[in-house]
Amino acid sequence: MNKRGLYSKLGISVVGISLLMGVPTLIHANELNYGQLSISPIFQGGSYQLNNKSIDISSLLLDKLSGESQTVVMKFKADKPNSLQALFGLSNSKAGFKNNYFSIFMRDSGEIGVEIRDAQKGINYLFSRPASLWGKHKGQAVENTLVFVSDSKDKTYTMYVNGIEVFSETVDTFLPISNINGIDKATLGAVNREGKEHYLAKGSIDEISLFNKAISDQEVSTIPLSNPFQLIFQSGDSTQANYFRIPTLYTLSSGRVLSSIDARYGGTHDSKSKINIATSYSDDNGKTWSEPIFAMKFNDYEEQLVYWPRDNKLKNSQISGSASFIDSSIVEDKKSGKTILLADVMPAGIGNNNANKADSGFKEINGHYYLKLKKNGDNDFRYTVRENGVVYNETTNKPTNYTINDKYEVLEGGKSLTVEQYSVDFDSGSLRERHNGKQVPMNVFYKDSLFKVTPTNYIAMTTSQNRGESWEQFKLLPPFLGEKHNGTYLCPGQGLALKSSNRLIFATYTSGELTYLISDDSGQTWKKSSASIPFKNATAEAQMVELRDGVIRTFFRTTTGKIAYMTSRDSGETWSKVSYIDGIQQTSYGTQVSAIKYSQLIDGKEAVILSTPNSRSGRKGGQLVVGLVNKEDDSIDWKYHYDIDLPSYGYAYSAITELPNHHIGVLFEKYDSWSRNELHLSNVVQYIDLEINDLTK
């Protein structure tokens, strides 16, 4: 297995206006370990307790501050932060100069940022990124490692947190932080503005060093970290994606832990966009992970490491012409030993919002479903893909000279046809999608194809015979709701393999129902079982656990602010009415929930573990909730609530699995993926390892 390190680099910025300030005390310099840096700091010290009173380091720092480039390296903890607080400040404290200061600040939402202000020079910069910090892990305050680089040569201000570049902003008018007019105060835990402390902080600064130099990316990478997390998928890895969403985890019978995810190239936007499905695996209980590969991908658009704009003008830009995959789910078939992965498939330019809801994309002929195609220049779908991939003309009732191969590529007379690939960039303030000169095989899902599928959503299946080391070509599943209804939407996460039979089940949803896809022959054929739900427009993403033989409990997202559940007592054939869990809150739009049945007893009872945000005000406050199962009636007592991080820190889609050593692996979106302010964040899908004792304290 190709093992790799987890230091990563990313770049995202938010430009704004103003905000901050603070005050003074004393310090002692320690010998601190900051990796293989090429120069010595002009100041270093620690540790400092911040309790709503600033610490003045002016006499120790200001006379040494010189030159036009600086670096600040800081290790700090803040598990009970104020809503807005300054960690470090340089300022002109005299009357009339309240807007002359530099500040490194944080918010209690996990945002980190800087302000650089000089009223006389007309400089007013604010750069920040939300969802950048950790507050606590396993009940203890987390030490965050912050590096801020002010580089006069490149005219950039760059922030790294916990080994991740969270923003790098280039400006036309660069102001060195050392050249702010009239600096006379250097403070920890506040900024001194006109003699008053502003943005007081709570927490601790364990170590801090300042350098009269802009240190390099390579030097930053040598600074030791105390991260509680890993990155399985990261910006710039083998996927060449800058963004990832919708994680899954699944522990195979061999002990290998498999993960899949959306590798997103057009920011964090859902389809329509360019999105592939990537996978990685671990053979050592999640300690190290293989280099990602693709389980499903299209080639109509190039895999590009693009930094999507986060400003209000451009952040809503979406790739409009690419085909995509989205929302994967995994199950292992114990009979054949193969791994099955399903995902939604979207043709070029199609997403949930604009998919044709009244067309399956298939035509039924003599009890068989055939994929429909429209030829360029036609007004309707006059062709179908028949046996052996032959493209059949429905008007003449004759085969054509065209065929579709197992990759859904178009051939004429046995010869592959091609289209020109697209690349994207931002030019003159707008998104540009342009041909790049590379020819790729023509595919019926591509916008430039001679033949195109119906612009609706589909479900695809791929399998792996070697536990995720490689994947076969995907195949479309047939429609389950008839010709005149679009496909159901896959519930991302895990499928369910029943213990005492060969049955496999995946949960999907459509308007007003959960539609369970069931296979009893290792995924060769599928049937459906429908269960009505009292929501017409809910994204009812569901996950299943088998409480005991043939008894399945499904937990799912709703529009009620609660997690719903239903039960089947006949291996998924029929389902109970919907009930709701008390004691766990979600927003009115809901969030995906992840669930597993734990293999060991907890407090002498069988147990279920849920992963969910527990908040009415956003996708935040992530918890693992342990429920103890009462055998008499299959009711569940939700006894233990474990906080992933602070209640105000983001937690959106998640995946959990029981590792071979009985720990719990958690891969989750550590940000509020619903918030328009938190679009297009890189390296926020993070993996942690928890022991069951952590959850039940």
Curated annotation (Swiss-Prot):
The keyword RNA-binding does not apply. Substrate binds at residues 245, 557, 619. BNR repeats lie at residues 280-291, 462-473, 517-528, 566-577. Keywords: Glycosidase, Hydrolase, Repeat, Signal. InterPro entries: BNR_rpt, ConA-like_dom_sf, Glyco_hydro_33_N, Sialidase, Sialidase_fam, Sialidase_sf, Trans_sialidase_dom3. PANTHER family: EXO-ALPHA-SIALIDASE, SIALIDASE. Belongs to the glycosyl hydrolase 33 family. This is Sialidase B.
